[in-house]
Swiss-Prot record:
The gene is smpB. GO terms for biological process: trans-translation. It comes from Shewanella oneidensis (strain ATCC 700550 / JCM 31522 / CIP 106686 / LMG 19005 / NCIMB 14063 / MR-1). It comes from the Bacteria. Keywords: Cytoplasm, RNA-binding. Required for rescue of stalled ribosomes mediated by trans-translation. Binds to transfer-messenger RNA (tmRNA), required for stable association of tmRNA with ribosomes. tmRNA and SmpB together mimic tRNA shape, replacing the anticodon stem-loop with SmpB. tmRNA is encoded by the ssrA gene; the 2 termini fold to resemble tRNA(Ala) and it encodes a 'tag peptide', a short internal open reading frame. During trans-translation Ala-aminoacylated tmRNA acts like a tRNA, entering the A-site of stalled ribosomes, displacing the stalled mRNA. Belongs to the SmpB family. HAMAP family: SmpB (MF_00023). One of its GO terms (cellular component) is cytosol. This is SsrA-binding protein. The lineage of its organism: Bacteria, Pseudomonadati, Pseudomonadota, Gammaproteobacteria, Alteromonadales.
Length: 163
């Protein structure tokens, strides 16, 4: 007899910031936890998250994520006022925070959330990238490289079918 698992496996990736890889060149990526309220976790489980136009800033030795929209559910908490765009505190070690602060202040880096995902089924984590904004010519070079890869794959596939 087959035993049924009562818990559903949630998909690993919750949301991705697709514009981030287009707008920024990342030199380093790291994982950070999020400090969330109960209604936010329920909304995240339903996939009501938007990471576009989101960024991280440092204030008083702590990291906060600004611009992450979590749309509250209608059935969520009735006794708490749900603010969909409130600041979310990132949970990082002191060493990581000091490293980020140094690079942002001295070298002009930006900290951008790349994706949000589940870790071990219960913890919401954010992958943040440390990078600099791309110029227009960088974006054009990336587009040309991507188009060349597609064309190269097309030619290789055509050659395989002939030979």
């Amino acid at each position: 007899m087959v035993k049924k698992n009562s818990k559903k496996a949630a998909p690993a990736t919750i949301a991705r910031n697709k514009r981030a890889t287009f707008e920024y060149r990342f030199e380093e990526k790291m994982e950070a936890g999020l400090s969330l309220m109960g209604w936010e976790v329920k909304s995240i489980r339903m996939g009501k998250v938007n990471l576009s136009d989101c960024y991280v800033f440092l204030k008083n030795g702590e990291a906060f994520m600004h611009g992450c929209t979590i749309i509250p559910l209608n059935t969520a908490s009735t006794h708490v006022v749900c603010d969909p765009i409130r600041l979310k505190k990132l949970l990082l070690s002191r060493k990581e925070l000091d490293k980020l602060a140094g690079l942002v202040e001295r070298q002009g880096y930006s900290i951008i959330p790349i994706s949000m995902y589940w870790r071990k089924g219960a913890w919401v984590k954010v992958e943040i990238g440390l990078g600099k904004g791309k110029k227009d010519h960088d974006k054009r070079e990336d587009t040309k490289a991507r188009e060349w890869e597609v064309e190269k794959a097309r030619v290789m596939k055509k050659e395989k079918t002939r030979g």
